[in-house]
Regions:
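A helix-boundary/hinge signal
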Residues: 1-129
């Protein structure tokens, strides 16, 4: 889960199985009284705290991207740098034409990391230095 992006169809299947288990359905014809997305909300926001698998999967992929960025001397980082972004940094890396599924999965989480570590300065009103 932390190296590969889980396909949406598989996530939907997991959510369906989990919802059926929660609602104690032995067959698929019973009513689910609350949408699964609402059950996945936090307990403070009237949810039950179930994990949203898509978000969790992206978080795990972002964690791998962060490891590659922060630890350039790791064997994994050196291999990926030599193979996919030898002339730049992790945040400048692109998918390329012959990228592995693991690398494409990690790059899917790259925008999450960019939003989290780079400041986007607008008019400067809300930035205090």
């Amino acid at each position: 889960m932390n190296c590969f992006k889980i396909p949406v169809s598989l996530i939907k299947e997991f959510e369906s199985i989990s919802a059926n288990f929660f609602w104690n359905n032995s067959d698929n014809n019973k009513i689910h009284w609350i949408a699964w997305k609402k059950l996945c909300g936090g307990k403070k926001t009237s949810g039950l705290g179930f994990k949203d698998l898509r978000t969790f999967n992206l978080a795990m992929l972002a964690k791998q991207g962060w490891r590659i960025f922060k630890n350039p001397n790791l064997l994994l980082s050196r291999i990926l740098k030599a193979r996919y972004f030898s002339r730049g940094e992790f945040f400048d890396a692109k998918v390329g034409c012959n990228a592995s599924y693991t690398w494409r999965s990690i790059l899917d989480a790259q925008p999450i990391l960019e939003d989290g570590i780079r400041w986007h300065i607008g008019d400067g009103r809300s930035v205090q230095v």
